[in-house]
Amino acid sequence: MPVTDVSLETSLTLAAAHALVLLDDGVVGDPMEKTTLDALRWKLSAGDKITPTADARNKKDNVSVTVRRRFQFSSQLKRMSTISLVQTPAGQRTLVAVKGAPETLKSMFTSVPSDYERTYKGYAQRGSRVLALGYKFVDGMNKGDVTTIARDAVEKDLVFAGFLVFHCPLKPDAVKTLKELADSSHRCVMITGDNPLTAAHVAREVEIVDRQVLILDLKEGAKSESGASLLLPLSLGFRLGGVSVC
């Protein structure tokens, strides 16, 4: 399903923030990142160059993105970022694009919408995988700076570019398989690195739990449990389908 009605800056962030590699037999990497580029209608070419396809919404902007450096995804940091050169009719600019867990990136933005937490937690509660997007232009950076700059200096003072939301349906036989395991006296346990709200939704879908799940939410970077809060069900009036950016 194509991604439409997003700003050029969000499109550039989506096009740049990935770890896909082009080999002789095609693009290799995370299926969700491949899906994102396909939905955006951009394509990866040789030399880490990403351009809009002929039918892309941004084709008229005559832009291209060339990734110069990647800070790979880290499960501890919960994010990844890239430094890229963006070519436009007006000239060349240097773009930092960051993608990661919404709770982690929140402190890196210069400002966030008032409904930031409500929005991403609402999507997560419905079983979707949610990533926050951020960017900034650093036009004074030369080639030497690109190769030597520290990650901490890159991933700060970002502009919020939206949420990337993936709807990931269960495999057709998931519920049946887990029921068979439970019926044969096997205890089914979920271990996941996903958002707890997403995990709780999936656990209900596959019938690991059959009641409301209450989650103790400890703030990112907290050194004690004094700042913990209880996550309660949210009531939001929207539906999900495919990949969407909001």
Where are these regions (language model features)?
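C-terminal cap/substrate-recognition subdomain and adjoining C-terminal extension
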Residues: 176-179, 210-246
